[in-house]
Amino acid sequence: LTNNVSIENPKSLLAYGSRLYIVGNDFYSTDINSLQLLGQVGGFVNASHCAIIPQNRAFVSDRDESSVKLIDLNDYRIISEIETGENTSPSIIINKYDKSFVLNGGNNMNYDSTLVTITYKDDLIPLADFSGNLVIGKNPSSAVNSGNINVLCAGVYDESNPSDNIESSFYNIYPTDLLINFSQNLSGIYNANNLVETSNGNNYYFTANNGIYRTNTSMSNVNLVIPIQSDVLNITTEKYAVNDSTDAYSNFLYMNDLNNSGTLYKYNINLSSFVDTISVNGQIIDLAFKN
């Protein structure tokens, strides 16, 4: 960071307005343009991800304490803590309507299969109340909130004990009443993660044990499209040159390569081809786009 502060053990990023939030051993708030540190909050055992909620507050999941901690972004302090269950390892947090949806991520040794909700407002009254619990697939790993809440579950993937493996799965959930609309096992796919959606809402992409997959939103046509092992994947829309006189817009995937540390690939979905390779010093842990 620009004011000589080191981020200890960075794990995830969230770009939100003029801020870039970084979760590491602590929670860090920075200016997205200058990367100047604006605030820092400690008090976590194993912080994982964050989400910004109304009234200038943030939720941060703490995997080892099986809780979500509420941060006041005015004075950068933890003001409450919401338990998510015993040994649940909460991770990803996404917002929809008046709630945050928390994925209890589990792991290969102690898997979890739950999604919990925390209601953060009632009209204009700020809240932070546990409000629901839903059993879904093994080890929920990522989600998008287009229309319903769409959750990808990693299953169990252990290369040294393949007999213990459990296939990944997908759940489409009504956000208002926390009921499952439909679910789908992903045959032959393990360790699915990093669910992203195209801008037209027609397709998802996600990472898995043997590469990056594309699917329609009903999960009825799932195909391996990029055979690169990756654990960082994000999507954005950019303009590109079709020829000397014509430009077009496409979704672009950005992904790391687990077999080539520090390598980031850029993939044009319209062209179904890689268009750039970016090299950085060090391991790529997460990727966020400035709005």
Whereabouts are the PLM-identified features?
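Structural motif
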Residues: 28-29, 67-70, 109-117, 158-172, ...
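A short beta-strand motif characteristic of beta-propeller blades
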Residues: 1-6, 34-42, 77-83, 122-133, ...
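Post-signal peptide N-terminal segment of secreted/secretory-pathway proteins
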Residues: 1-52
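Solenoidal tandem-repeat scaffolds enriched in leucines and small polar residues
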Residues: 77-171
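Conserved beta-strand positions in repeat-built beta-propeller and related beta-rich domains
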Residues: 14-26, 60-64, 102-110, 151-164, ...
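Repeated scaffold domains used in trafficking and secretory/extracellular systems
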Residues: 7-16, 45-55, 86-95, 133-146, ...
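Loop/turn-rich, solvent-exposed surfaces of beta-rich toroidal or solenoidal domains
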Residues: 189-257
